[in-house]
A protein has these predicted regions:
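A short, well-structured juxtamembrane/interface segment
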Residues: 41-56
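EF-Ts-like protein-protein interaction surfaces
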Residues: 187-203, 226-239
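Cofactor-/ligand-binding subdomain signature composed of acidic, glycine-rich
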Residues: 1-38, 42
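Short, amphipathic alpha-helical interaction segments embedded in low-complexity terminal/linker regions
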Residues: 210-294
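Residues at the C-terminal ends
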Residues: 58-59, 154
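Glycine-rich phosphate-binding loops that contact phosphosugars or nucleotide phosphates
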Residues: 64-201, 208-214
Length: 294
């Protein structure tokens, strides 16, 4: 079995069970501070991944996450946040987890060791050369994620790995490897800690940067937000007001006239056109608000 730093004992926390609570938390916090630095070291690789994913998604491709345990749950979480945040259609960003939906809330014994299951799920998605598949595994050796990347590569998809060990078997199957090496965990082998935090940070970066590149924001405003609840409806009104400089009452009225479409309202206001013309401009510019304003 290959060496994995994430499974090693952390010499700095060997006495953690003897510490007062405040000292214990201080030690955990000190270890957590290493995570952002490890992620920063991988920014060049993350940037390459973002640009490559964006290129494929502009050709109609999907973004697929595949992983087991904590890694799989993090992928599922990131995928599930894209529709309400960026207005992506269901199926554009997909999360696959070993053991299926049951594994979101409880351990499914042996699921992560099922190499064939990873391959099968990628095949069932009919992954193709326009898609991007990210295998996530703290150890970098999870058979389920490795099988998924192997099948994706066979089908011509872009393959990316996120692991917290280097080198790793997972990275060996990927075109682009991202490996924030965070070192041994506070509790040996508990990769839901630093490794999980690092993976979440990388996934946040990838999905956010890709969506910005796809025109899902205007400035730093989430203009493709889907106002599906009271909080998001209030947010949509504030976004229109902040983007255009109008007071909240006027912005709310124009947003209503645009059927709640934030992008349409912003373009209509800033370009001085009707909602119908604003929609046409957005269609012609691929949904990029700045281009539609002209």
């Amino acid at each position: 079995m290959e060496f994995t730093l994430t499974e090693e004992r952390n010499p700095l926390t060997s006495d953690i069970d003897t510490l007062p609570t405040r000292d214990m938390l201080t030690l955990i916090n000190a270890e957590d501070q290493k995570v952002a630095l490890a992620v920063r070291g991988e920014l060049p690789n993350i940037a390459v991944a973002v640009d490559a994913i964006t290129d494929r998604m502009q050709r109609g491709g999907r973004l697929v996450y595949i992983g087991a345990g904590t890694s799989g749950r993090l992928g599922m979480l990131d995928a599930s946040e894209c529709p309400p945040t960026f207005g992506t259609p269901p199926g554009l960003v997909v999360g696959l987890i070993a053991g299926g939906s049951a594994a979101l809330t409880e351990a499914v014994e042996g699921a992560e060791d099922d190499w064939q299951s990873g391959r099968r799920q990628i095949a069932e998605l009919d992954v193709n050369e326009n898609d991007s598949v990210i295998g996530i595994a703290a150890s970098g050796r999870t058979p389920y994620a490795i099988g998924g990347l192997e099948e994706a590569k066979k089908r011509g998809a872009l393959t990316i790995s996120i692991a917290c060990n280097r080198p790793s078997s997972l990275e060996g199957r990927a075109e682009i490897g991202i490996a924030p090496v965070v070192g041994p965990e506070v509790v040996s082998g508990s990769t839901r800690l630093k490794a999980g935090t690092a993976q979440k940070m990388v996934l946040n970066m990838i999905s956010t940067a890709v969506m910005i590149r796809l025109g899902k924001t205007y400035s730093n405003l989430m203009v493709d937000v889907q106002p599906t609840n009271i909080k998001l409806r209030h947010r949509a009104r504030r976004i229109v007001a902040e983007a255009t400089g109008l007071d909240l009452q006027r912005a709310t009225g124009i947003l209503a006239a645009c059927n709640g479409e934030v992008k349409t309202a912003i373009v209509a206001i800033l370009a001085g056109v009707s909602p119908e013309i604003a929609r046409i401009r957005l269609l012609e510019t691929g949904g990029y608000v700045r281009k539609a304003i002209g």
